[in-house]
């Protein structure tokens, strides 16, 4: 293992011991925010420290076995060689494990997120596809034990959505779903197509981390225009008799957020503000990323329509992820929510990219 990596690990052990001591301090115990943050840091460091301790023990075992090679007893030398083989295998395994544990973490990975799906080119067929995508993500979330809560839905007359926004909450939601941002293209024969011609339509997906109140960007109320209106679905379904739906316009950026899912105006306003916070935060993140001008490719899409990440080809039963050149012929399973076969390879590729950048340092 590189000397620089060992030094980094030694520093983390020192910090772990420091955090452990602080968690027993009555002053820290009395400060809920501080105690919560330190507890989180403690749990993040715990695995790294345990892995490094095991690594050091394996190094000691190797050194002891090497000393035994000098023994006169042939049986002892044979035992030493066996122990050396075991220790080297353990060291190799732990080195890989520790490198993964040292990878830079996206601070938002554990956050809940907002999932936004918008119909693009393709008219009614694109809106139907947006509905299919929303159903696919909802099923996937259900399989992970996550909760999906509708924030706003602009339904299409022929089914599906022109736009749908939902909040997804649960363990590590953003860290997994963030790779879904980008352009999704569908190729299939619409039900209304009498000639059997394949149509191509598209949707854009944007995944934004939900920002905790303590980290929220301060928004000047004077920079907001808030309108109320009556909620309604396509063809007048779910019509509310009161003006409970909310539209918030952030004047400096022109961002517009609507929420009409709840019957309470107060709840709709709170949800809309959360979405606005997430979008403003995304703008800041994109600015920061542009300033850093990172040369390393990013697998996390911007939600831009031009950035096509995946194609769903129904006649061939095929799904292709263009970022990692992965094609699978299990479209039926994917649209029913079995996204694991697409999500896992993307996460592995992302991890490999991070490991490569760590070894370059």
Swiss-Prot record:
The modification N5-methylglutamine is found at residue 237. Gene3D superfamilies: 3.30.160.20, 3.30.70.1660, 6.10.140.1950. Residues 287-306 are annotated as: Disordered. The keyword Coiled coil does not apply. It comes from the Bacteria. Methylated by PrmC. Methylation increases the termination efficiency of RF1. Its main location: cytoplasm. One of its GO terms (molecular function) is translation release factor activity, codon specific. Peptide chain release factor 1 directs the termination of translation in response to the peptide chain termination codons UAG and UAA. Belongs to the prokaryotic/mitochondrial release factor family. This is Peptide chain release factor 1. The gene is prfA.
